[in-house]
């Protein structure tokens, strides 16, 4: 039986991802210490789980360091890594939006500046709208950008909208909804086909019983 490695996301989706695998009967009671250890081996079932930054999950999967991984649809669309997206896991719901001060919604700027952690998504969105924008790539809290005059608007992921409201910003336009997805390394799906398909089936059975973990 082949070893299977799985990359799980740190942060807001970690608990839901772990719960999903436990409900599916995969690595029961194995994952409780993963936030401390980062890598957990299930020697009995020949499985290895690793906890990585959500943005890094597709890279681990694309390069074969992980056979499977969980990350948001937003990350997949931004990075366009060479791996298979096989299942919508129905948790980690959020939206990619254009947001800014209320006055930004009521005005039209031909050369507006857009601050974002998702430059590829932002560029493609405004290109399709025929709008000429300057994309400013940030790694931290993008909500600050319009407040201090770095940009007119932002493109970012919104879950509850509380952070926007707290900073005097509103959603101007929704780009797409996002949720957690299961991704698979292309080579692994060929060489470890039976084991990976068994895992996918078990996870799918759990996903079909609920709307959100």
From Swiss-Prot:
Pathway: Amino-acid biosynthesis; L-histidine biosynthesis; L-histidine from 5-phospho-alpha-D-ribose 1-diphosphate: step 1/9. It catalyses: 1-(5-phospho-beta-D-ribosyl)-ATP + diphosphate = 5-phospho-alpha-D-ribose 1-diphosphate + ATP. This is ATP phosphoribosyltransferase. GO terms for cellular component: cytoplasm. Lacks the C-terminal regulatory region which is replaced by HisZ. Catalyzes the condensation of ATP and 5-phosphoribose 1-diphosphate to form N'-(5'-phosphoribosyl)-ATP (PR-ATP). Has a crucial role in the pathway because the rate of histidine biosynthesis seems to be controlled primarily by regulation of HisG enzymatic activity. The keyword S-adenosyl-L-methionine does not apply. NCBIfam families: hisG. Belongs to the ATP phosphoribosyltransferase family. Short subfamily. Pfam families: HisG (PF01634). One of its GO terms (biological process) is L-histidine biosynthetic process. Keywords: Amino-acid biosynthesis, ATP-binding, Cytoplasm, Glycosyltransferase, Histidine biosynthesis, Nucleotide-binding, Transferase. It comes from the Bacteria. It comes from Thermoanaerobacter pseudethanolicus (strain ATCC 33223 / 39E). Its EC number is 2.4.2.17. Heteromultimer composed of HisG and HisZ subunits. SUPFAM superfamilies: Periplasmic binding protein-like II. InterPro entries: ATP_PRibTrfase_cat, ATP_PRibTrfase_CS, ATP_PRibTrfase_HisG, ATP_PRibTrfase_HisG_short. It is found in: Cytoplasm. GO terms for molecular function: ATP binding; ATP phosphoribosyltransferase activity. The lineage of its organism: Bacteria, Bacillati, Bacillota, Clostridia, Thermoanaerobacterales.
